[in-house]
Every structure is written in structure tokens, then in C-alpha cells.
Amino acid sequence: MGTALKLTQTLVLRDPDNAGHAARVTELALRLAAAMDVSPSRVKAIKAGGQLHDIGKLELDRAILDKPGALDPDELEEIRTHPELGARMLHGIRSLRAALNCVLHHHERWDGGGYPYGLGGEAIPLEARILAVADAYDAMTSLRPYRGARTREEALAEVERCAGSQFDPRIARVFLSL
């Protein structure tokens, strides 16, 4: 995992707030994977994917990432490129191949309304579906430049509300039981 650590450190240097986010997402996703009795190979992918899921943001304009208000359509489109940018960054690194699907698909939605490919249901790799719940929960409970943090209860209610649309309903149920 030396390469993953170096890439994570690079991201942290550019975006210190992301350090805590990546660590929290990884921890939540690993707890969720353990509760679901996920195989060791998938756990390894989730660990690396959690650390690196936003690595593509290294390629984005810092002003967009730090913008305090709503993003305009062009800025939103640029943000939505980060999964593919991250996957391209990892593509040639053999030791991080397991993380590739997590990085590429963590913004796909159970109902097919996500990005970058609009995958839905079981077409989304399990590791990415697990990370999606952990990532969204941490995003909701963290202070962002454009909004305040939600309470734990508010975020859990949102995960429950989005089960079957944004999130795999089985994974959401397990997450809510943690």
C-alpha cells in the first residue's frame, strides 16, 4: 500500500480537509464491509478505494472545490469528472488495481442516476456501493464550504430515505444498523 499512501499524502497536501474525509470514509466502509461479511479481497479494495476515492480531485480547479456557494452547471460538470480522472491516475499502478472500481464508480446510484456511466443496481461493483454510502454519510455530517454539517440523526434519516434510489437498499439497511 506504499503507493496508496503516497497518493493519499499528495491529496492531503493539496486539500487538507480531504485527509479526514478519506480516513472517515475508509473506516465507515470497512465497518460496513465487516458487518456484511465481505471477502478479504473486497475488503482490500475497499480500504484502498476509501483512501483514494477522491484522488481525481487533484486534477480539478481548486477554486471550484473551495467555492462557498452553489456550483454553476459547468463547475458541476467538472466536479463530476473526478471519478474518471482518478481511475486514469490509478490505471497503470498494478498494486492499486483493486481500488480502481471504487474510485471510478463511487458516485453511481442504485437507480442508475449517478455518474460517470449511469450504472444501476448490481451493475455497480459491491465495493463502490459500500463506499457510496460511507462517502455520502461523511459528506453530510461534515462542514462544507457551501453548507453546514448535518447531525448524525439527519444523515441517517437521509440514508434511510435514499435506500433503493441512491443507495443499495441492503447496504443502507446494514449501515443503519451499525
Cite the ranges covered by each PLM segment:
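Metal-dependent catalytic cores of enzymes that make or break cyclic nucleotides
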Residues: 4-178
